[in-house]
From Swiss-Prot:
Entry comment on modification after translation: Contains 3 disulfide bonds.
Annotated localization: Secreted; Nematocyst
Superkingdom field: Eukaryota
InterPro entries named among the record's database cross-references: Myo_ane_neurotoxin_sf (IPR023355)
Keyword field: Disulfide bond, Nematocyst, Secreted, Signal, Toxin
Main location: secreted
Name the record gives this protein: U-stichotoxin-Hau3a
Gene3D superfamilies: Anthopleurin-A (2.20.20.10)
Amino acid sequence: MNHLIILVVAAVFLGMASAEDVFHKRFTVSCLCASDGPSVHGNKLTGTVAVGGCNPGWHKCNTEHNVLYECCKKN
């Protein structure tokens, strides 16, 4: 019985982790990092908009100061 509970908890945990990855891939907005160049024409937007600030493991990648969001790039 204990093995079954552990198996169910592990399956739920793995399901939540993969659901978070899917959400991040589908619902992200790209932004222009300082390393992308002076304009968006022909350049890839390598940053991701993060509401309220960059998440752990990410860093702010431009020089703009916004109250609601930051342009972040994964370390």
